[in-house]
Amino acid sequence: MVHEQFTGTSPLPDTWDLLQGDHLGQPMLVRLNTGAADLAGRGSHDIRVGVAVPFNAPRPDGLPELVEGDALEDFEDELVDLVGGRGTLVAVITTGGVREFVLYTGEEWWIHQFQRDLASAIPSHRVQVSAKPDPDWCVYRSFGP
């Protein structure tokens, strides 16, 4: 959830949709934070942060095994805690042996430390973090809202 001090608005609703499809012939699961739609394109959160975690032992269909999936759920909780009020998690995309967490933020000063902290949060996996301007929320909007 995004905090009032960060957005200048009331806290956003914590509502998520589950979408299913395929990407390059493999199943794709997307959890989409529909409560964040009001922030899209408003200008306060124009930096997209992608956090990609490749699976160590994906199933043949590219999805995680149960044990690895559980570890990634714990990682997601840690990720949300580390972001705090600096941004909001808008999507979690699972496909092709990777889980990607998509966030939007208005500031990037904290991202380098965030990347180091994430690597410590799941030392059994490689964590890749990227940040790019995305004032139109292209990734988020590609899933429909």
Name what the model sees in each region:
Residues 78-85, 113-121:
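Generic non-transmembrane alpha-helical segments
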Residues 49, 99-101:
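Short amphipathic alpha-helical segments
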Residues 104-112:
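Helix N-cap motif at beta-to-alpha junctions
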